[in-house]
């Protein structure tokens, strides 16, 4: 019957051009129409879809206007701004790593106006996907000049509350990591508590590391991610990567803050951060060696807060 055919087609899914790589077959099972409307561009690929979901996850964690640039499911650019100043968030997000922005996913949690579209055009930036809850008519006209760019208007930032993946001959499920650090989560453990400005940046940094592959370090200053290190097998290497990238793009780390998505097993990260001008640190805590990191922070007058929430991401 037509009903049986429809059910069978649903579970077989819609074929995608290919998977992560051209030699891998891929399908999407479900309805993308519930999440977004495609306004322009060619068919979405497997990589486009997983990166776009990652992008929505980042910007929807913020109440304030936020702009993120995603590459391989990692936030390589992220900034927040005041209401009506989303364009400033875009500029800061782009400046964090203009090289990695090439071929990335642009995501905003507010309407994209003409001013942002003009910037993207002037930068001659190639991007795979641009997604936002709304676009002005003029912005859309400008962005549509990019023939191959997929422009998506999201209907809802709500993502599935369960995450599913195959493992051996079975399936693993887990709850999505939806916790967002707030002021009530922060416990100052050093002699000097963070200033209001540092606290605001620490909360942004905590969101950033939540959306980076472990081991991850995020460096934030003035409401923007200025560098990050991710996917490293040691935490100190993630920090070294972040510092190197910040220096490469000309950022002054003096007054920046640092987030780690898991505890510091040794005080080496805090020591290196302080040596490079970082003034405040946020991490979950929970190491048997926490006190060594706290003592190191106190030695350098670095403020440290612990949250009790780890954000490993594999």
Regions inferred by a protein language model and the residue ranges of each:
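Internal active-site segments that recognize and position negatively charged phosphoryl groups
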Residues: 57, 183-228
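Short, basic, helix/turn surface patches
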Residues: 101, 156-164, 178-187, 303-314
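Short, basic/hydrophobic alpha-helical segments
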Residues: 114, 118-122, 243-251, 273-275
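Gly-rich Lys/Arg/Thr-decorated short loops/hinges at beta-loop-alpha junctions or inter-strand turns
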Residues: 32-43, 97-103, 175-192, 222-225, ...
């Amino acid at each position: 019957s037509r009903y049986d055919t429809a059910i069978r087609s649903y579970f077989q899914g819609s074929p995608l051009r290919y998977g992560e790589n051209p030699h891998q077959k891929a399908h999407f099972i479900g309805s993308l129409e519930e999440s977004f409307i495609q306004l322009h561009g060619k068919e979405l690929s497997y990589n486009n879809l997983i990166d776009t979901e990652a992008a929505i996850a980042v910007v929807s964690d913020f109440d304030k206007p936020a702009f993120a640039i995603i590459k391989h499911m990692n936030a390589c650019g992220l900034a927040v701004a005041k209401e009506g100043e989303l364009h400033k968030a875009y500029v800061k997000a782009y400046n964090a790593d203009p090289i990695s922005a090439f071929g990335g996913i642009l995501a905003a949690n507010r309407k994209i106006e003409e001013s942002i579209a003009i910037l993207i055009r002037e930068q001659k930036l190639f991007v795979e996907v641009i997604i936002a809850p709304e676009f002005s008519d003029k912005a859309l006209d400008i962005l549509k000049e990019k023939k191959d760019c997929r422009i998506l208007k999201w209907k809802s930032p709500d993502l599935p509350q369960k995450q599913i993946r195959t493992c051996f001959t079975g399936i693993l499920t887990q709850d999505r990591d939806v916790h967002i650090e707030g002021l009530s989560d922060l416990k100052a453990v050093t002699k000097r508590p963070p200033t209001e400005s540092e606290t605001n940046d620490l909360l942004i940094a905590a969101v950033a590391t939540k959306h980076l592959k472990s081991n991850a370090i995020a460096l934030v200053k003035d409401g923007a991610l200025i560098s990050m290190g991710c996917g490293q097998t040691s935490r100190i290497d993630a920090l070294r990567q972040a510092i190197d990238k910040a220096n490469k793009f000309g950022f002054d780390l003096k007054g920046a803050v640092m987030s780690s998505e898991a505890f510091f097993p040794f005080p080496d990260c805090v020591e290196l951060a302080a040596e490079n001008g970082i003034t405040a640190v946020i991490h979950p805590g929970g190491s048997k060696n926490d006190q060594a990191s706290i003592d190191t922070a106190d030695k350098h007058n670095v403020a440290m807060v612990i949250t009790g929430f780890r954000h490993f991401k594999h």
